[in-house]
């Protein structure tokens, strides 16, 4: 059981959040009247009161100074899994992300060399609306057993990211995942850039904690095909059987299947799989591996405990 010590809002971006006695939460926006609301996964930001109190040993800060909407006592929020669900009165929040990078002009970091929001702040979307008040209790709800597996899709394409070519593979993956029951949290289109890809893989696996990341493109022999190397650089455990199975299946269709350098790995509880770049090859490979992925993903997440066939 936790307690709301402060509710903070700001009417415009770039201005400090200040405490208010109450607020209205809506699924469409987040906190009514707060500039950082919208139709996205970071409608409401939360920070543990205990973390603010510890930071005050270095520098006194008011509630809202870190850009947080809700100051919550009684929970170490950043240690909870994504998604976690909270009830505040009639309102229900779904925690969707842990941490985010400070903006480039973070005054607190300039003063102290540190800011706790990137590692201690969490973000949520409003599942059910309601009015909340300072002093309200916040309850951690049981995670629903029927939640869909959560996925993200990344297309790697220099031409696609510059608007010179339509991305057909990414939307196809989203369509196939959705049809299979996955919830696709994000679909990104990036250039073949190692730094950008690594940043997004780390964010999706560590902060958003999606169950599955599928990349498309950048798995061949061209000089800018860097997807497998970046994928392996973020891996904590190898899962080579998936990439090997795709190569085996591709070889039954074309001898060029041997030219794929695709990797498949695990980072914490997130499975990352590299798919080819062409829509035809994406469809062929994903149709082949998709029926078996869910069991492996659930094992990695600790949701299934039995792997042997009966």
Q: Model-found features: residue ranges?
A:
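N-terminal small/polar loop signature for handling phosphorylated ligands or for N-terminal nucleophile
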Residues: 178, 184-215, 220-234
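Well-ordered alpha/beta subsegment
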Residues: 121-144
